[in-house]
A protein has these predicted regions:
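A fold-level detector for beta-propeller and closely related beta-sheet-rich head/sensor domains
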Residues: 1-138
Length: 138
């Protein structure tokens, strides 16, 4: 690339003040280098440079930001107050869609569509993956 990393960031902006509250690199180059590129080089993986992104975040009333738009096949949850990554899960392939949430029987779920083959070297496949959020304490 012609620019220095990071190549993707997640940024929180206070729209009333017009100020950036926090920002963080989004995505990790670990298994996303295509074999022809990776073979001749010895790169110290993972590289926390961020990956090109396709898709956007979902925000919850409880202050979580879910996003799966990166090329490293992960869905992540961040704390909206400080940008700290709280959770991540590996998906079958990249999630280039905005996650959504639904409730069944009092239990909250986050679901995301993954696939679409956004990168030439990415695994093909179209899947829907759902994650159950921890049950609320009684």
């Amino acid at each position: 690339p012609c620019t220095a990393p990071p190549y993707a960031e997640l940024v929180a902006v206070d729209l009333q003040q017009g100020e950036i509250l926090w920002r963080g690199t989004l995505g990790v180059w670990d298994h996303t280098l295509p074999p022809p590129m990776a073979a001749p080089y010895s790169l110290p993986l993972p590289l926390k440079w961020g990956t090109p992104t396709f898709g956007g975040p979902m925000l919850t009333a409880g202050g979580l930001v879910f996003i799966g738009a990166t090329g490293d096949d992960r869905l992540r949850a961040f704390d909206i107050r400080d940008g700290k990554e709280l959770w991540s899960a590996t998906l079958p392939t990249g999630a280039f869609a905005i996650p959504m949430s639904y409730e069944i029987g009092g239990r909250q779920f986050v679901v995301v569509a993954s696939g679409g083959h956004a990168f030439v070297y990415q695994k093909a496949g179209d899947q829907i993956t759902a994650f159950a959020l921890p049950a609320a304490p009684r």
